[in-house]
């Protein structure tokens, strides 16, 4: 059952919380591993995460038909069922290459932060210093802490490290401007 008006606001910087149409989502996840898998897919560093990367990070094996089936059975099917039941739609997009999140109905703080810093770097490379520093200041406002603090997982840990590094770049640019 698709609820076309449902929107999600997902906070991953400094904490993990989901708001459904403005209300805090408090239902229990099917399992910690399904929640962790979903959070891995929220990484703003890639449009999608390849099947090989997912298999290696969650099952610790290269992609194969058996590994893909394992991902489907252990993570994707329970997650799809949960998302449709709780949110009224499934924001996952799967292809032959991998799986990602459809951002059209999701406001994801880490995605907004990452995009804002990248826009600032692009503006800086084009010589638009003031516009770039405005973007970096906006990014500083968006960054409310480390990505999914305390949440385990290889993709999450790599994303956390990368976003912390990007934050330091934006912060240094703002400090250097002052």
What residues fall within each predicted segment?
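Intrinsically disordered, low-complexity protein-interaction/activation regions
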Residues: 1-178
């Amino acid at each position: 059952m698709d609820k076309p008006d449902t929107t999600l606001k997902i906070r991953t910087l400094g904490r993990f919380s989901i708001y459904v149409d403005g209300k805090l989502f408090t239902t229990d996840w099917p399992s910690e591993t399904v929640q962790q898998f979903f959070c891995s897919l929220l990484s703003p560093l890639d449009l999608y995460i390849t099947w090989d990367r997912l298999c290696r990070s969650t099952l610790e094996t290269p992609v194969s038909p058996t590994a893909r089936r394992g991902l489907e059975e252990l993570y994707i099917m329970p997650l799809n069922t949960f998302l449709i039941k709780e949110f009224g739609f499934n924001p996952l997009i799967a292809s032959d290459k991998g799986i990602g999140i459809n951002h059209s109905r999701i406001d994801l703080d880490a995605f907004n932060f990452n995009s804002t810093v990248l826009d600032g770097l692009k503006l800086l490379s084009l010589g638009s210093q003031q516009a770039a520093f405005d973007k970096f200041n906006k990014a500083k406002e968006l960054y409310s802490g480390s990505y999914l603090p305390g949440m385990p997982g290889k993709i999450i840990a790599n994303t956390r490290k990368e976003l912390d590094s990007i934050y330091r770049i934006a912060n240094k640019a703002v400090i250097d401007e002052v």
